[in-house]
Amino acid sequence: MEVQVAPLRSWEDFFPGSDRFGRPDFKDISKWNNRVVNNLLYYQTNYLMVAAAVVAIVGFLSPLNMLIGGTVVILVFLGFVWVSHNKDILRRMKKQYPTTFVIVIMLSSYFLISYLGDVMVFMFGITLPLLLMFIHASLRLRNIKNKLENKKEEIGLKKTPMGIILDALEQQEDNINKLASYIPKVKE
């Protein structure tokens, strides 16, 4: 299936008034995780633009350190994904505790970058965009259009870059399994 880039959402949709933002339910982690995953899928191009702006600013101020930092994070991420696919215990951990898995990747990257050089580049150039994405995805309430687009991604009608990343983190399999078990019930 061909990878499609999600459209850039309008500013009014991406950052509307305060009525479209809400505090996540910290007691229901699966619901919060679902909101984050769905917002990451729906607003992925907007998040990419925000991250690109932050990376460009930090990269302009310190290009070599930004290149080293980005390379380290990508290599650590790919290494952890590869190991988790080959080691069953890590695969289960990644599936049960996705936030912990991402934190381990970020901490490993942090220590490698601190060993290699400039930690501030890591903090502002790599961690800040991820933090901004997570905060927005956690607080932004979903709308009907968001839900419809996410269903296309879940059932495989559409494949996007964020969908590929979330698949690598095994965050979409549960949704597909739920949908697959729901379809026969609807037919009855």
Curated annotation (Swiss-Prot):
The keyword Iron-sulfur does not apply. Belongs to the PRA1 family. Binds to prenylated RAB and Ras superfamily members. Regulates intracellular concentrations of taurine and glutamate. Negatively modulates SLC1A1/EAAC1 glutamate transport activity by decreasing its affinity for glutamate in a PKC activity-dependent manner. May be involved in membrane traffic. The keyword Transmembrane applies. The gene is ARL6IP5. This is PRA1 family protein 3. The modification N-acetylmethionine is found at residue 1. Residues 136-188 are annotated as: Targeting to endoplasmic reticulum membrane. The chain crosses the membrane at residues 36-56, 57-77, 94-114, 115-135. One of its GO terms (biological process) is intrinsic apoptotic signaling pathway in response to oxidative stress. Disulfide bonds: none annotated. It is a multi-pass membrane protein. InterPro entries: Prenylated_rab_accept_PRA1. Keywords: Acetylation, Cell membrane, Cytoplasm, Cytoskeleton, Endoplasmic reticulum, Membrane, Transmembrane, Transmembrane helix. Residues 1-35, 78-93, 136-188 are cytoplasmic. It comes from the Eukaryota. GO terms for cellular component: cytoskeleton; endoplasmic reticulum membrane; membrane; plasma membrane; presynaptic cytosol. Pfam families: PRA1. It is found in: Endoplasmic reticulum membrane; Cell membrane; Cytoplasm; Cytoplasm, Cytoskeleton.
